Structure formats: structure tokens, C-alpha cells
Amino acid sequence: MNQKLLKLENLLRFHTICRQVHSPSQRRLLAWCRHGFAPASSVWRDLLGARSWQTDMLIGSALHQHRLLVTKKEKRPPRSQLSPVKTKKEVEVWVGMTVEDLASAMAKDIDCVYEALLNTAIDVDSLEANSHLDEVWIKEVIKKAGMKLKWSKLKQERIRENKDAVRRPGTDPALLKPRSPVVTVMGHVDHGKTTLLDKLRETQVAAMEVGGITQHIGAFLVSLPSGEKITFLDTPGHAAFSAMRARGAQVTDIVVLVVAADDGVMKQTVESIQHAKDAEVPIILAINKCDKTDADPEKVKKELLAYDVVCEEYGGDVQAVHVSALTGDNLMALAEATIALAEILELKADPTGPVEGTVIESFTDKGRGPVTTAIIQRGTLRKGSILVAGKSWAKVRLIFDENGKILNEAYPSMPVGIIGWRDLPSAGDEILEVESEPRAREVIEWRKSEQKEEKGKDDLKIMEEKRREHQEAHRKAREKYGSLHWKERSYIKFLERKQQRPLKPKEKVERQSNVLPIIIKGDVDGSVEAILNLLDTYDASHECELELVHFGLGDISENDVTFAETFDGVIYGFNVEAGSAIQQSAAQKGVKIKLHKIIYHLIEDLQEELSSRLPHTLEEYPIGEASILATFTVTEGKKKIPVAGCRVQKGQLERHKKFKLIRNGQVIWKGSLTSLKHHKDDISVIKTGMDCGLSLDEEKVEFKPGDQVICYEENKVPTKTSWDPGF
């Protein structure tokens, strides 16, 4: 209304001015101006201004009352004329909704959702229309859109369908058929496990293993003279492969615990017992090396009582068999005990329907691609079967046994090699058969998306933790600097930045010399896993940082050499090879490649490499020892110098070596001599039995009769890493 009045007022003023211009008096003034007889500017302004002022006064007085009346009315309009309060739009959401679902629920374009998620921790580029959003991101989008969130009562029903493959439920008892037992041989290193298996199957597996130590799991089907069959898993016994032993216990029916009669219970023996108990697998005790003269089987049984392994002789249910793997004595009794226990367990499986199994080991073969060793636990495996394991799948091209013989079918309890995997599954992964390749891809995609979602949740937790840490640091900073003057605050911050200054070149070299980047390559998945588990025990980072740059399977490649060159690292290979071209390339780039076939040697080599990165230490080597018999002072100029009269007890004192003074077993001084005399002659060496006088480079030190003077030299010696891998 005020705007309209203002326009009316301006219009009336303009109209008044126009009338004045066209009046006779005004026309006369304009004519004078045209003919050059214009009056002075002040007179002109007075004439026109007076009339304008009078007109303005008339218009102002006419409109003043009306303007006030309108303004009063506009100040408080009637309640009925007030615009209604806008309420936020309510959006119904549910757990697990996709980007497309959220956009549809908001009645917005899908780009609005992407725009709302910009500048957040979520990777917008990786989002698709069917990507599932966590609750925190759903709330964020709704908040930025200025809407109100409402959780759907049916949100549980809207969660996406689980598309994973799972094991079948219980089987009809009528379909169950007896199967061979799967037996895992466990025990301490070099207690004779592989030799025992070698005798049972009459092969030379033990001779094929480097150093007689099994490096990774072997699965074998052993046929006994009685016609019975037993599947044996031979797991390594030394500390590096405890994870592989644990995996063996997860797929086994019976554990044969091998303990040497002369060594007794060892560290890995105890670990094997724990693995069996955790998996709730019964134990058969095989006391090996009973042919030795110092064998004591009864001592072994008594030692095992402390670990709740009670033999039948002591009222327990654990069968104990005394054997000699070297001579073959009593091995049939061990096999019969295994079969007897299997009969008690009534081991059965369903050979029909989709296949179920477990990956025992996996590796990459140059000519055949990814290969797995597996134990079939249910169903019958055939060529052409579609399998999924972990996040990889296969269309079976080839099935073979432990001897390389091609098989058409594989039944429950059979150990087989499988070829046809698209990617390499991990040892311990569950094998499941699905109906088709599209279904296999669907399962893999589901598992990858689940893993990605879990990773997103973990990342969110980490971000939240970092946010809390940042807030706490900010709060502490405010408490620290809040009461200080800005000059004091600036000075303190300057000192703190100075302490965190960039390293100088020399310091940088010293810092880098205390870091060892390494690359690990192994022949099979289980071996690499065992090495990584060993590296997890590294606890000497205060001496030298151990950085794992890369690990993988297969022979050393050019990429590995490039990695090592980039990080100035060392390549360690276990049961793999490096071609001549690779070795030549590594030599040109200054990259070390270290290949080993026994894990002990690899770890020892790694310890030596770590030790080489450590600074040398100084060790004292005594040269001679003398006792102080008397003390006196000698005047030189204005100084009085204390002198000790000594007699050499051991070795000799050399003038230019280092000395230390010991009193009551405590070192009270270290340094050099200023003089060494025999009678009045300066000499450089005093031998055993001779008397001498000596003075120190520190005059404040007081001698006392009975003190010991030690002459020594310092030598630099290499420092050994304190890391103990547990062998």
C-alpha cells in the first residue's frame, strides 16, 4: 500500500510542475532564458523553488493523514490474512533402500541425492542407482533436502533379498551313506608325521619335501590292506604354520597326535591339542620313535594329562598306539584304531545333490591357471559343475587325485585337485555348487557388495573415531592456549612447529636406513598366509620398521622388481623361482632377490637383513687391570694434580687406550690418561707385575687405595634384532 501512495505522490508532483511550466509567468521566464536574458541562477532557483516548495507542502499535508492511517492498518493485519506456516514434507524411508528408492520417496530427481552426498565421506562416483545406502547417509540426504524423516513400519520387509549361496539344510537319513574318515596328522616339528604317512601309503613324500619338513598341506587318500580308505591331511608342525594346522582341524573327523617318545610334549604339540579341542575333534595318540633307546612312552602319557588328554590306561577315552614310523612297527594298529574310532563316530554323508566342500590349498599353475586342493564333504563333484568359493567361481574343467590321475567323479571324503577357477580362492573357503554361471556371478556380486558394505561401515566407524579425536584435540588446544595472550600463544606454537620441522638430508638418510620394505611371494596360498602370520609377530619396530609392500603367489615378476625398486625393498620368495631375465633386471636396478625353500632359512635371512639396518654397538674389550696402592699429588706450575700409584694385576696398561676407574664394583669415571710413568720415565705400556704412576684427564676425581683401574678398547660390533619369531 505504501508503494502505491508513493507512486501517486510522485505523479501529483510531476503534474504540478508541468502546470507551472505552462503558466504565463513561467513561459516569460523561459523566453528570457532563450534570448540570453536569463536571470541569475539564484533568482531562478528562488522562483521555481518557491513554487515547488509550496506545491510539496500542499501534497504532503494532503497525503500525510491518509498515509498514517494506512500504515497503522498494515502493521497488524487480521489473523485470517496471515500466510499459513509451511510444514516439512515427510519422507518414508527404510533400512537398505537404494539411491533410486530414496529419490522416488522424496519425489526428486536422482541427481538430487547425488548432489546431497557431495563433500561427504561417501564415494559418489562409485554409487549406482541400485546402490544401497546406510542409515547415516539416508538421514543426511533427507536433512539437506529440508524434509522430515519417517521410518517405515515395513522396513524389514523392504530389505533386499539375500542372494548368497549357503549349505543345504539337514539331509534325509535314507540318503546318507558311509564315508571314509578324514584324519589330520598333527604334532611338533620333526616328530615323524610325514614319515608315518609315507609308510602308510608306501610313497616317498617325505623324501620330496625339502629338509624332510612339510611346507604346505598335502591331502592323500590311503587304501589299507583291509580295503578301508582313510583320507589323511598332513599339516606342517613348526610354529610358522599354526594357522594351517587350525584349518586342517576344521575339516577333519579325527586328529592323530604324533608325539616323539624321546622329546615328549613340545610347544606345537600343545597348540595342536588346542586346535583339536576347539574343533571338538577326537584325538588318537601316536607315540612315535619308540625304537629309540631313550624312548619313554609312559612319560609322554603323563605329560599329556596336564593338557586334558587322558589315555585309556589312565581311565580316559584317548587311544594310545606305540609306533615307529622309521621301521613301520605297529602302523597297522594305528590304522585299525582310526577305523575303529570312525565306526564309533558313524561317519556318513549324502552323495546326492549339489556339492559342498572346503578349499584346503590354492595356487596358480603356469599351464593350468588357478588350482585348488579340496575335500568333498557332500554331493558328487563332476566335470562341468559350477562352483563358488569365497569371491571366486569355477566351471570345473578337470578333476585329479593326489597322484595326478584324472577323475570323472569325486565323492565325499575324497581329496581332489580342481581346475577351472576364474580367480584364486583362499585356503579355508567353503565350496558350494550352484545351478548355473549366472547364478554363480550373482552370488559373487552379492558377496562383494556385502564386503563393500561392511567396509563402508568400518570406514564410517574409523571416521567417527577420528572426528572424536579431532574434537578432543581441539578442546585440549583451547584449554592450553585459551588463557594466553596472542603473542605468547604464537611463540608456543612456533616452538612446537620447530620441533616438528622437516628432516634434514642427513637425518632423512638415517631415518630411511631404519626401514625395511619387503615383498613376499610364495607358491601356495597357505604358505604365504603362514609367512604373513610370522610377520605379525614382529615387535621390534623401535629398532627398524618392517613394511610389507606387497605379497602374492607365483614366481618373481618384473612388477615385483619394480615395486622393490620404488620402495628400496627386498624380495623374498618361498618355493618360487626368478628367471634369468628377472634376476638380470633386479641386478641392474639394485634390487635384492632372496629365494628359499625352507621357512626357517627365510626368517633367518630376514633377521640378518633387519640387523644390517641397525646401528653398530660399541663393546668394551679389557686389555689390562691395575690396583691402586697409594695416592699422592704432584705440583705442576700452580696446579696440584692427583696421582695414583698402581701395580698391574692382569694384561697391560697402554697409554693411548681408554680407561675407567672402578670403586666397590661401580664405575665412577671413564676417560683417558694425561700421564703414565714408571719411576720418573714416561712410558706407553706397563706390563703385568710392574708398578706405575698415572693421572687422569679429570682432576676432580679422587683416588682411593683399593680402587681398580681398567684399560680397555672399544670395538664396533653388528647389532642383532631383538625380534624372536618363536621358533
Swiss-Prot record:
In terms of SUPFAM superfamilies, this protein maps to: Initiation factor IF2/eIF5b, domain 3, P-loop containing nucleoside triphosphate hydrolases, Translation proteins
Query: In which residues is GTP bound?
Result: 187-194, 234-237, 288-291
Q: Report the main location listed first in the record.
A: mitochondrion
Residue ranges, annotated region (G1) = 187-194
Q: Which residues carry this modification: Phosphothreonine?
A: T688
Give the record's family classification. Answer: Belongs to the TRAFAC class translation factor GTPase superfamily. Classic translation factor GTPase family. IF-2 subfamily.
Described function = One of the essential components for the initiation of protein synthesis. Protects formylmethionyl-tRNA from spontaneous hydrolysis and promotes its binding to the 30S ribosomal subunits. Also involved in the hydrolysis of GTP during the formation of the 70S ribosomal complex.
Protein's recorded name: Translation initiation factor IF-2, mitochondrial
Origin species, per record, is Mus musculus
